[in-house]
């Protein structure tokens, strides 16, 4: 059941990254991109109606996950991996 949750999170993240248009990627300096990546967390929340498929898959309401470059924060645990802009990060959930 956790695999379904992880796959759903990765799918949502992939759809989110594909929805953004690549504006100015050729002109963007690598240093600017790196600064943006250091300060950016992506939040993935699971919740909603009690009858949803995720609730049936034993997912607790209010679970929030972040793609982190470094280790997971306090009260977070490593739940897998996530991709953002072609890079792989840690998926930390609380």
Swiss-Prot record:
GO cellular component: extracellular space
Keyword annotations from UniProtKB, A to Z: Antibiotic, Antimicrobial, Defensin, Disulfide bond, Fungicide, Phosphoprotein, Secreted, Signal
Pfam families: Defensin_1, Defensin_propep
Disulfide feature: 65-93, 67-82, 72-92
PROSITE patterns from the UniProt entry: DEFENSIN (PS00269)
Pro-piece positions: 20-62
Organism annotation: Rattus norvegicus
Protein localization: Secreted
Similarity section: Belongs to the alpha-defensin family.
Top-level division of the source organism's lineage: Eukaryota
Name this protein carries in UniProt: Neutrophil antibiotic peptide NP-1
GO biological process: antibacterial humoral response; antimicrobial humoral immune response mediated by antimicrobial peptide; cellular response to lipopolysaccharide; defense response to fungus; defense response to Gram-negative bacterium; defense response to Gram-positive bacterium; disruption of plasma membrane integrity in another organism; innate immune response in mucosa
Signal peptide: 1-19
Purpose of the protein: Active in vitro against S.aureus, fungi, Gram-positive and Gram-negative bacteria and to a lesser extent against an enveloped virus.
Tissue specificity field: Highest expression in bone marrow and to a much lesser extent in small intestine.
Keyword hit for Phosphoprotein: yes
